[in-house]
């Protein structure tokens, strides 16, 4: 019975234990599940928090970078503005200094000219004083001679009276016979005295003759006159046929525009059969244009690139001819040992005219005349030839350098160490400075003989060339201008600018400034068109 009772109790106890264990296991699993869920939730919350923190940090960093970029941009802009302002200040300061230096140079040149004129006047005054002193001395000598003659005449009259009385007393001659004897004796004495005076005068004249002979001869030569044939400002190129005119013009006239821009010469195509005309005041440019056009016509391929190639070849060929012309002039006159740069400058005179007269031919002629006269006068013939040849050397580059051709010639010859006599002859051949040697006088005389022949020179042509030269100088005086050409007989100026220095907007201002300066400084008939050309060329080569 007890056993029977114990079994249910044991069963109940076991069931209770099993239930307790099972419940504990279930409850433990539930607790672990909740803990795991709580841990997962905590991890998710922590991850979200970290993500939000990272996003916030990224946003803060982005804002910092943006702030830094804005600050850097502001600093760069500030630096650029400062640099731009400094550059403008430097440009303005440089421009102001250049203007001041230019004005100082002009004032210095004017002062030099005034000083030279003052020296010339002083020299002339001293010469006049010397002549006046000489005349005063001669006047005193004449007075002394007159007094001496009067005294001698009085003495002669006294002697005549004494001798007449003696003749009356001794010879008992009548008055007429006595008078004849006395006059004969007196005549012989006067003849001797006059011969002595003439002999003394001749000796005095011969003593001065050697000093004044050269000056007298030179003064006589300077009274001569002379001149040669004038040249034109156009060149004509023959065409094989009329169809060539269309090829020269090109599509919409692009070939003409390219040719004129590269050479600075007007290309005139009219109704004249089988010819085109090249017009320009600069003979060197015109010669380059003529040779380039002849090459293009012979080649047949006429387009802007080919035109540029032919113009470059013609320019090199003309430069070679210029040097050869200088050497030929030296060989013709027998001159040796001259600086090559001076020879090249001398050769440029072949393509220059003065009042229509070819300057190189004129210079050679002056050299020959000066040498011939120097040989006749016993002076240094070679030095006279050299001075005569170089007297107008400044005209070769007076279109490119400011100053008169005399000033430029003096500067050139001094730079290349020419003799002082040659430099003075150049400086004095227009009377700007005193002549310090007879050779300088001979150069003036030879220049007059060569350049003053009737009909040789043309004043209107020289004025025309000077006006076109002044137009180009005004255009080239502005910063950024690469080249300028006066064309259409001075009715148009084409100005080529550097594209990296002058913007499109600046070209408008540049054209206006050039126009204003031309209107202010030049006198001209009609209107002048100012054309500013800005061309940027980019070349890429595919290999």
UniProtKB/Swiss-Prot annotation:
Domain KH: start-end pairs: 233-296
Family matches, as PROSITE patterns: HD, KH_TYPE_1
Enzyme Commission code(s) on record: 3.1.-.-
HD domain residues: 359-452
InterPro entries referenced in this protein's UniProt entry, alphabetically: HD/PDEase_dom, HD_domain, HDIG_dom, KH_dom, KH_dom_type_1, KH_dom_type_1_sf, Ribonuclease_Y, RNase_Y_N
Domain of life of the organism encoding this protein: Bacteria
Primary localization: membrane
GO molecular function, one term: RNA binding
Compartment annotation: Cell membrane
Keywords, sorted A to Z: Cell membrane, Endonuclease, Hydrolase, Membrane, Nuclease, RNA-binding, Transmembrane, Transmembrane helix
Matches recorded under NCBIfam families: HDIG (TIGR00277), RNase_Y (TIGR03319)
Known function: Endoribonuclease that initiates mRNA decay.
Stated family: Belongs to the RNase Y family.
Protein name per Swiss-Prot or TrEMBL: Ribonuclease Y
């Amino acid at each position: 019975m007890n056993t029977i009772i114990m079994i249910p109790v044991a069963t109940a106890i076991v069931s209770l234990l099993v239930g307790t264990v099972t419940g504990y296991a279930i409850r433990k699993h539930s607790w672990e599940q909740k803990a795991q869920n709580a841990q997962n939730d905590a991890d998710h919350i922590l991850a979200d928090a970290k993500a939000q923190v990272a996003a916030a940090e990224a946003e803060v960093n982005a804002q910092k970078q943006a702030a830094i970029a804005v600050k850097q941009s502001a600093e760069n802009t500030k630096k650029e503005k400062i640099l731009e302002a400094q550059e403008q200040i430097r440009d303005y300061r440089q421009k102001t200094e250049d203007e001041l230096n230019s004005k100082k140079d002009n004032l210095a040149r004017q002062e030099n000219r005034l000083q030279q004129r003052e020296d010339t006047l002083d020299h002339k005054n001293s010469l006049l004083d010397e002549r006046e002193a000489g005349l005063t001395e001669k006047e005193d000598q004449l007075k002394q001679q007159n007094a001496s003659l009067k005294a001698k005449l009085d003495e002669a009259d006294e002697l005549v009276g004494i001798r007449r009385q003696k003749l009356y007393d001794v010879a008992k001659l009548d008055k007429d016979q006595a008078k004849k004897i006395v006059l004969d004796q007196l005549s012989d004495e006067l003849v001797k005295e006059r011969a002595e005076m003439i002999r003394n005068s001749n000796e005095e004249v011969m003593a001065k003759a050697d000093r004044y002979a050269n000056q007298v001869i030179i003064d006589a030569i300077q009274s001569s006159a002379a001149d040669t044939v004038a040249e034109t400002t156009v060149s004509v190129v023959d065409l094989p046929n009329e169809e060539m005119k269309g090829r020269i013009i090109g599509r919409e006239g692009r070939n003409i525009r390219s040719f004129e821009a590269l050479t600075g010469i007007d290309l005139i195509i009219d109704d004249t059969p089988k010819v085109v005309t090249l017009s320009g005041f600069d003979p060197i440019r015109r010669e380059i244009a003529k040779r380039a056009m002849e090459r293009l016509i012979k080649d047949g391929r006429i387009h802007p690139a080919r035109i540029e190639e032919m113009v470059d070849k013609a320019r090199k060929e003309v430069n070679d001819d210029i040097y050869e012309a200088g050497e030929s002039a030296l060989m013709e006159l027998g001159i040796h040992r001259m600086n090559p740069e001076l020879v090249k400058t001398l050769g440029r005179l072949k393509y220059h005219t003065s009042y229509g007269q070819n300057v190189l031919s004129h210079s050679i002629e002056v050299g020959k005349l000066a040498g011939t006269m120097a040989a006749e006068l016993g002076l240094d013939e070679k030095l006279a030839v050299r001075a005569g040849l170089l007297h107008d050397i400044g005209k070769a580059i007076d279109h490119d350098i400011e100053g008169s051709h005399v000033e430029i010639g003096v500067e050139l010859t001094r730079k290349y160490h020419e003799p002082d006599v040659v430099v003075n002859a150049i400086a004095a051949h227009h009377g700007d400075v005193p002549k310090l040697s007879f050779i300088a006088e001979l150069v003036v005389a030879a220049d007059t003989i060569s350049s003053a022949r009737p009909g040789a020179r043309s004043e209107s042509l020289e004025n025309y060339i000077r006006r076109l030269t002044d137009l180009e100088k005004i255009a080239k005086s502005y910063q950024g201008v690469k080249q300028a050409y006066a064309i259409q007989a001075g009715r148009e100026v084409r100005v080529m600018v550097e594209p990296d220095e002058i913007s499109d907007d600046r070209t408008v201002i540049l054209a206006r400034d050039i126009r204003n300066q031309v209107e202010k400084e030049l006198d001209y008939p009609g209107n002048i068109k100012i054309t500013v050309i800005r061309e940027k060329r980019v070349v890429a080569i595919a290999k």
